[in-house]
Amino acid sequence: MSSGGLLLLLGLLTLWEVLTPVSSKDRPHFCHLPADPGRCNALSEAFYYNPVQRKCLKFRYGGCKANANTFKTIDECKRTCAA
């Protein structure tokens, strides 16, 4: 194979890696934790990843001491956990 062909193959493999969604085995373990409102009573809006529905959902967050499957924005949740 020529060096141009190898370069093209390398470019395509790199693009495939970047565009391939996160698989369930690659998700951080905390993405499988349930929504956790925490122990405080602030009741603000937050997001968590629901592995059954395979998407990020909104929930009421108390403001402190929740698990790691708690995100301030839906985009942060999607970047971390969603496939």
From Swiss-Prot:
It is found in: Secreted. SUPFAM superfamilies: BPTI-like. Keywords: Disulfide bond, Protease inhibitor, Secreted, Serine protease inhibitor, Signal. The record marks N41, A42 as: Reactive bond for chymotrypsin. Expressed by the venom gland. Belongs to the venom Kunitz-type family. This is Kunitz-type serine protease inhibitor 18. The lineage of its organism: Eukaryota, Metazoa, Chordata, Craniata, Vertebrata.
